[in-house]
Regions:
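Gly/Gly-Pro-rich "capping" loops immediately C-terminal to redox-active cysteine motifs
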Residues: 35, 47-82, 98
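Cys/His/Pro-rich metal-binding microdomains
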Residues: 43, 65, 94
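C-terminal capping alpha-helices of c-type cytochrome domains
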Residues: 80, 86, 98-117
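Short pre-active-site segment immediately N-terminal to redox-active cysteine/selenocysteine motifs
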Residues: 37-41, 49, 106
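Bacterial N-terminal signal peptides
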Residues: 7-17
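Positively charged n-region of N-terminal signal peptides that target proteins for export
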Residues: 1-5
């Protein structure tokens, strides 16, 4: 009986210690959105040279490196993601916010993630 109780206690402890990715209902992270080929799809145009798990990246957009140096003010980066046509009418980058391809919350998550690169 003690062995069974110890086994159950061990299983419960293991379940509680599982990382958030294994938990149902977990909200998407900025990286999830960036890597999502049907949502953000940032990988289609941008390279992510510091992320080994970023496979099959594009090269038509600037690489996502040194983002804090390039965008010291995160609001400028957010504005670019929301609608890059404001600063460059001929850009190929989709206006993710203007066209509601991403929600405000999703854009904030993407900005936080990309700014950390």
């Amino acid at each position: 009986m003690r062995i069974a109780s110890a086994a159950v206690a061990g299983l419960l402890a293991a379940l509680i210690a599982l990382p958030a990715v294994a938990q149902p209902g977990k909200s998407e992270t900025g990286k999830d959105i960036v890597f999502n080929r049907t949502k953000g799809n940032c990988l289609a145009c941008h390279g992510f040279p510091t992320l080994p798990d970023a496979e099959q990246t594009g090269n038509s957009g600037p690489p996502m490196i040194a983002m804090q140096a390039r965008f010291p003010d995160k609001t400028v980066l957010r504005a670019k993601i929301w609608d890059a046509t404001v600063s460059n009418p001929k850009t190929f980058m989709p206006p993710f916010g203007k066209h509601q391809a991403l929600s405000e919350e999703e854009i904030d998550k993407v900005v936080d993630f990309i700014h950390s690169l």
